[in-house]
């Protein structure tokens, strides 16, 4: 199993990150919070990972913090929650927000996450409430991302729409969310603001 990767950040195209580790490129899927925290292309980075093995593929999922990776591992234990949906949940809200909603049993708020219907939200609350006891309000990482002015705002917005679609949003909804964000922001900032527009 691969527990972490340490190398040069080669590319960022949500939801995927490409890391060069001694000449080998590892493709890693990650929640948006990790994109905000990881740095810029060319930086030396370290990602905690979880290897997910299926019949048809071996996938790597990456996380900027142990708290996120731990919640991911708990989420994929829930019946009906796959790795992709778990990444979508972690992209839609912070670990603390999720733990808080589960703790108070706020299933309706969880249905605002793409792909999470009423039954799935209720199952998340029921199955995870006991498992998340003691998580409290763990320190969430303070993410600071550099805002880089894009020379091609249209392409940035198109890439942001694609990223939101890959996180489970419908095309029309993703397009509407991105169009509401001001132009000239980095890809990460555009996605972050689009996700913030969905009030959870």
Curated annotation (Swiss-Prot):
The keyword Glycoprotein does not apply. Coiled coil: none annotated. Keywords: Cytoplasm, DNA damage, DNA recombination, DNA repair, DNA-binding. Residues 144-154 are annotated as: Flexible linker. Residues 154-200 are annotated as: Domain III. CDD domains: UBA_RuvA_C. Its main location: cytoplasm. It is found in: Cytoplasm. Residues 1-64 are annotated as: Domain I. One of its GO terms (cellular component) is Holliday junction resolvase complex. The keyword DNA-binding applies. GO terms for biological process: DNA recombination; DNA repair. The RuvA-RuvB-RuvC complex processes Holliday junction (HJ) DNA during genetic recombination and DNA repair, while the RuvA-RuvB complex plays an important role in the rescue of blocked DNA replication forks via replication fork reversal (RFR). RuvA specifically binds to HJ cruciform DNA, conferring on it an open structure. The RuvB hexamer acts as an ATP-dependent pump, pulling dsDNA into and through the RuvAB complex. HJ branch migration allows RuvC to scan DNA until it finds its consensus sequence, where it cleaves and resolves the cruciform DNA. Has three domains with a flexible linker between the domains II and III and assumes an 'L' shape. Domain III is highly mobile and contacts RuvB. This is Holliday junction branch migration complex subunit RuvA.
